[in-house]
């Protein structure tokens, strides 16, 4: 279907949303080998998580637009997840619900859109080419389909480089939340050319 040319409202940044380097268990020292048993065990532990949720600050920055928001990400089952973007006043600007074969997005005017690919739809409706299909793995600290990545000294992802469909995404992790088991990302930045996506996770609930 042809999707309308909708643009997410530009949200005013607040001091509370400034994304700074995380000091929670930040990566340091020389990286570890991707072939290490500790890394394989960490991946297995993360993949066992069936349900999880996280919330925090989101920023999308490019030559054309800057968007700052709060986000809430909830996964309720395999390939079933919900993404909310809210403004500083707490009002919902975008709600996306995805399940296999069906994606629904509701904008800040209550307009509902449906499609079968979340990544394509959110890109067309908001003008933000967010790599949702890969981000679902990256936000967990997993490389997804990427084969070019490095680990930190705690056998967790430190950097990912992924090339697909003319995009060259680089993902850098600058902190992990060690209060959760397994440790989950607390700060990450995605970049492709002049585009940057920053995520700062306030907390995680994992099951």
UniProtKB/Swiss-Prot annotation:
Q: Where in the cell is it found?
A: Cell outer membrane
Lipid attachment of type S-diacylglycerol cysteine occurs at which residues? Answer: 22
Q: Which NCBIfam families match?
A: lolB
GO BP annotations, alphabetical order: lipoprotein localization to outer membrane; protein transport
Q: Which family does it belong to?
A: Belongs to the LolB family.
Q: What's its membrane topology?
A: Lipid-anchor
**Name listed for the protein in its UniProt record:** Outer-membrane lipoprotein LolB
Q: Which SUPFAM superfamilies match?
A: Prokaryotic lipoproteins and lipoprotein localization factors (SSF89392)
What is the superkingdom listed in this entry's lineage? Bacteria
* Keywords assigned: Cell outer membrane, Chaperone, Lipoprotein, Membrane, Palmitate, Protein transport, Signal, Transport
Which N-terminal stretch is annotated as signal sequence?
1-21
- List residues with covalent lipid attachment of type N-palmitoyl cysteine: 22
Q: Which Pfam families match?
A: LolB
Q: Which GO terms describe its cellular component?
A: cell outer membrane
Oligomer status and interactors: Monomer.
Function, as annotated: Plays a critical role in the incorporation of lipoproteins in the outer membrane after they are released by the LolA protein.
PROSITE patterns from the entry?
Answer: PROKAR_LIPOPROTEIN
């Amino acid at each position: 279907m042809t999707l309308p040319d909708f643009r997410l409202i530009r949200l005013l940044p607040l001091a509370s949303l400034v994304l700074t380097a995380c000091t929670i268990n930040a990566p340091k020292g020389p990286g570890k080998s991707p072939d290490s048993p500790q890394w394989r065990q960490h991946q297995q532990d993360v993949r066992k998580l069936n349900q999880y949720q996280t919330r925090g600050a989101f920023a999308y920055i490019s030559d054309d637009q800057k968007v700052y928001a709060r986000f809430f990400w909830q996964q309720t089952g395999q390939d079933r997840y919900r993404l909310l973007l809210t403004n500083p006043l707490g009002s919902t600007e975008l709600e996306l619900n995805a399940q296999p074969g069906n994606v629904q997005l509701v904008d800040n005017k209550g307009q509902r859109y449906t499609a079968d690919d979340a990544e394509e739809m959110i890109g067309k409706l908001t003008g933000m080419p967010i790599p949702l299909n890969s981000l679902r793995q990256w936000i967990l600290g997993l490389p997804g389909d990427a084969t070019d990545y490095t680990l930190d000294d705690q056998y967790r992802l430190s950097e990912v480089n992924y090339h697909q469909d003319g995009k060259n995404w680089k993902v850098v992790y600058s902190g992990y939340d060690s209060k959760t088991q397994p440790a989950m990302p607390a700060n990450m930045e995605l970049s492709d050319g002049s585009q940057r996506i920053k995520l700062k996770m306030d907390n995680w609930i994992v099951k």
